[in-house]
Amino acid sequence: VTAFQVDHDPVRPAVGYRFDWKGRSVVVSGDTALSANLTQNASGADVLVGESLAANLVGMGRQAALAQGNSRMAKILADIPDYHATPVEMAQMAREAGAKLLVYSHHV
């Protein structure tokens, strides 16, 4: 098992994991934006379990928070896209890394 740093600022440390066993590999991205380190650690993985951000849903949540006068929650929701990958971004990264299978998790 290898732990590696991922980009989830402002939360630090944040890590992903690579599990290698008998020539097979599974990478779990954890909460992250895309980064060269994630791509490198996902290189050639049999399975990449990657998070995905539904930006439209987060945007709807932000609008609802604003409508209720909850500026703190609106700010949190406005910042979420800065440290999470979209499904398309994760798919592009998985292709670049040569991962054989991408499984989405942690749908934000």
Map each language-model feature to its residues.
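Flexible, acidic/histidine-containing loops and adjacent segments that form or flank the divalent-metal
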Residues: 2-13, 21-24
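N-terminal post-signal-peptidase region of extra-cytosolic proteins
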Residues: 3, 29-32
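Cap/insert and terminal regions of metallo-dependent hydrolase folds
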Residues: 16, 25, 33-108
